[in-house]
Amino acid sequence: MAAANKGNKPRVRSIRFAAGHDAEGSHSHVHFDEKLHDSVVMVTQESDSSFLVKVGFLKILHRYEITFTLPPVHRLSKDVREAPVPSLHLKLLSVVPVPEGYSVKCEYSAHKEGVLKEEILLACEGGTGTCVRVTVQARVMDRHHGTPMLLDGVKCVGAELEYDSEHSDWHGFD
């Protein structure tokens, strides 16, 4: 069927612009309303009093410093630390009390692509087992899909070396 259509004339279609749209003056850039809050790290409280932190798109094999603010939590005191259940890919750097709650800074390593969730537990110094679970969710892109626009509060701090067999220093046996 596809071979039968080869001899047909190609269809010509036109594009019409709405009135007031200048085709020559348009650019290939996407512009968003300045009032949108899509460019910040989103922190939402879940039903079980844990927090979900959405950090947007990240690139695989890169390390990021993520800073966000948790609202005041009555179960935490001023002396907050990471619970002794460390995550391999998410490391707590600091927790500082601020008027809005707690400013949390952590380092995230994007180790594989897809929608990834890593957890840290925040505990009180000398507390009686009171912990708050914080889940950081990231959408990690592979290295062939460009560089993502990072949200406010997300900063790239380094790239991990990627093993590629074509760039090996080994020349084989002599």
Swiss-Prot record:
One Pfam family linked to the record: DUF4517
Keyword Hydrolase: no
GO CC annotation terms, alphabetical: extracellular space
Sites bearing N-acetylalanine, chain numbering: 2
A single MF term (Gene Ontology): protein phosphatase 1 binding
Compartmental location: Secreted
GO biological process, one term: positive regulation of protein kinase A signaling
Keywords: Acetylation, Phosphoprotein, Secreted
Main location: secreted
Positions of post-translational Phosphothreonine modification: 147
The keyword Acetylation belongs to this UniProt entry's keyword annotation: yes
Family: Belongs to the ADISSP family.
Role noted for this protein: Adipocyte-secreted protein (adipokine) that acts as a key regulator for white adipose tissue (WAT) thermogenesis and glucose homeostasis at least in part through activation of protein kinase A (PKA).
Protein name: Adipose-secreted signaling protein
Organism: Homo sapiens (Human)
Name of the gene encoding the protein in the UniProt record: ADISSP
